[in-house]
């Protein structure tokens, strides 16, 4: 059965489900209340075609409520609901992130996407004669589905238990033994010209020295290598729990990041950016550097870039035209660099260094809210 392309509003989520249409003018309201020019849609497409293709294409805008990448895992309330919808159809979901609502409209014109999602309150509108579409709406327009997606995302971001064990941050301080893997750190740190204790500090931050650690996003092993990263590095996925293989893979990734930030000549500063990119992704860090540079800051000085890493969590900044990769949960990345630098200093037996940036005023310690429920450092 053929349908017109209608607006589907799922709780607080606007879906433009492009199920089919014949030369029809569509009136599109942007998330900001403005009306786009009418879009002439002339594609014929139905659910059977989507299922036959095996792929549902979602266009959206970057943001915490729509879609973003977090340590290699796709998140966002609207994304999670669209993923559920794709699962119900038995197809995979592909995401096309657009710059703005005008680009979303262009995707409609070109027939490049099957649905568009953004946050916009309103009502459901559907032609009652289109019984299949109406039934789809009845099945999916439940407030509980939106709430369930939000709860799923919250659970993923605040997960307390993963398959890991807690190891001491230092086995024998008197003898200078940090972990059971010091030999591997000493061997592979030479490839990246790091102090081996810095790599050990990073490893503790990643996995607490547990070779079997697994994050909610699927990162594995001592240095938390993602399966996709392993593929890129030519490392067999089934070897990621092997300590030496995992540390060697991390060294390869660190070396790639060093090359990616070779424009930062000062080694200490370059290492800060490498650590930040290992955690948050080099593209996001480059976005923060671009913002810092535009505002007259030194883009090669981490203390001047770190505030912009945090700003990438706010719409004013992640929607800025200079930003290419959108929303980022930057607080974890800034904290990541600080903690590794501090632990590295403790491994060296010196006072924790001041790298020039602290995201907040000192406050009473509370329970950690990162992907591992670690004991206090």
Model-found features: residue ranges?
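Export/targeting segments at the very N-terminus of extracytoplasmic proteins
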Residues: 36-38, 160-209, 247, 262-264
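Substrate-binding/active-site groove segments that recognize
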Residues: 212-238, 246-256, 340
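C-terminal motif of bacterial Sec signal peptides marking the signal peptidase cleavage site
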Residues: 18-20
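Hydrophobic residues within well-ordered alpha-helices
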Residues: 85, 108-109, 137, 202, ...
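Low-complexity, Gly/Ser/Thr/Pro-rich intrinsically disordered linker/tail segments
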Residues: 332-377
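Extended ligand-binding regions for polar small-molecule ligands
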Residues: 22-41, 76-88, 124-161, 175-179, ...
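Extracytoplasmic small-molecule ligand-binding "clamshell" domains
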Residues: 27, 31-119
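Catalytic and substrate-binding regions of cell-wall glycan-acting enzymes that process beta-1,4-linked
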Residues: 124-125, 132-136, 272-346
């Amino acid at each position: 059965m053929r349908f017109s392309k209608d607006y589907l509003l799922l709780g607080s989520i606007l879906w433009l489900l492009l199920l089919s249409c014949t030369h029809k003018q569509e009136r599109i309201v942007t998330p900001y209340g403005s009306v786009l020019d009418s879009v002439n849609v002339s594609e014929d497409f139905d659910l059977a075609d989507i299922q036959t293709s095996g792929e549902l294409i979602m266009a959206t805008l970057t943001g915490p409520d729509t879609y973003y990448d977090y340590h290699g895992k796709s998140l966002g309330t609207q994304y999670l609901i669209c993923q559920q919808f794709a699962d119900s159809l038995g197809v995979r979901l592909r995401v096309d992130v657009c710059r703005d609502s005008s680009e979303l409209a262009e995707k409609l014109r070109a027939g490049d996407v099957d649905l568009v999602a953004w946050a916009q309150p309103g009502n459901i509108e559907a032609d009652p004669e289109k019984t299949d579409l109406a039934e789809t709406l009845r099945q999916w327009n439940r407030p509980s589905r939106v709430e369930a997606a939000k709860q799923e995302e919250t659970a993923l971001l605040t997960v307390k238990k993963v398959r890991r064990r807690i190891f001491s941050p230092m086995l024998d301080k008197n003898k200078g033994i940090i972990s059971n893997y010091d030999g591997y750190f000493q061997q592979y740190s030479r490839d990246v010209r790091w102090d081996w204790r810095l790599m050990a500090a990073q490893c503790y931050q990643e996995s607490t020295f547990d070779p079997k650690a697994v994050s909610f996003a699927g990162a594995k092993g001592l240095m938390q290598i993602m399966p996709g990263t392993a593929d890129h590095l030519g490392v067999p996925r089934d070897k990621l729990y092997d300590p030496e293989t995992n540390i060697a893979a991390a060294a390869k990734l660190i070396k790639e990041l060093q090359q990616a930030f070779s424009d930062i000549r000062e080694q200490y500063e370059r290492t800060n950016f490498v650590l930040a990119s290992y955690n948050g992704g080099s593209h996001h860090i480059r976005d923060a550097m671009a913002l810092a540079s535009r505002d007259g800051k030194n883009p090669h000085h981490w203390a001047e870039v770190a505030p912009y890493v945090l700003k990438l969590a706010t719409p004013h900044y992640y929607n800025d035209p200079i930003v290419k990769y959108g929303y980022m949960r930057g607080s974890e990345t800034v904290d990541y660099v600080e903690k590794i630098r501090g632990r590295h200093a403790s491994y060296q037996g010196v006072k924790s260094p001041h790298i020039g940036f602290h995201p907040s005023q000192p406050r009473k310690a509370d329970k950690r809210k990162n992907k591992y429920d670690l004991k206090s450092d």
